């Protein structure tokens, strides 16, 4: 048995769940009476969504449907970074929604500082887009998990725990 235990804190989402969510949103938009004739398009790209629709009102309705469907499929709403809508030709509105994935250096440093200040028995190492927390006892790691969960709202990114060993 190893003398130390560790886990990784990451910020990720299930891409297939996002694809399924967007399929449900498209189906919902096609069936809703107020959105049926809006000619709404939702495109998924590698790091963002692009929503193109008829007006600001229909854009807001599509955003609400997207949030509701994502919540039902257990996707955190923190993965969506809604940019400001912009006008495109022919009275249409386009909005880019960035998808947050991975921990930025700034957030990783903030997270590591929080854990280091509160818990002295664990060590924190930033590894690219994740943070590894190592400790001698599993109880210390459980305390670290509880601490990170309690501070998740301050960090404004969805956090998951992986590789608990």
Curated annotation (Swiss-Prot):
Nucleotide-binding protein. Belongs to the YajQ family. It comes from Parasynechococcus marenigrum (strain WH8102). GO terms for cellular component: cytosol. NCBIfam families: PRK05412.1. One of its GO terms (molecular function) is nucleotide binding. Transmembrane segments: none annotated. It comes from the Bacteria. Pfam families: DUF520. InterPro entries: DUF520, UPF0234-like_C, UPF0234_N, YajQ-like_sf. Keywords: Nucleotide-binding. This is Nucleotide-binding protein SYNW1816.
